[in-house]
Amino acid sequence: MLTATGIRAVIGKGGMDQATLDAMKQYGCVYLAIVGGCSAVYTPAAKLVDDYWPELMPVDNQRLKFELNEFGPLFVAMDANGNSVYAQCIDNAQKNRPAIYQTLGIKE
């Protein structure tokens, strides 16, 4: 998709897999994460321009094109250097889990 469209930024709320992160690094694309609970802020700033493949259901499989005006707040969750805050969070949780379990008296 990145090579066919030339997309430089994707907006979402949950990240993408490692293969997509690798492709984003290769083509200089970033993943911008929306902040949960801000739909009242985001909605007025987005105007639907096109609906690609509207027959695809569920809606999360559709590809929509929006015109954005003063759209935010956003943060770079996956960058064009191959870094991912999602992967970092998982790594930190796994690294700290033994100590947390020990503190709470939970056996692994």
Regions picked out by a protein language model, each given a short descriptive name:
Residues 1-71:
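Feature captures the catalytic cores and cofactor-binding loops of soluble hydro-lyases/lyases
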Residues 44-108:
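C-terminal binding/interaction regions
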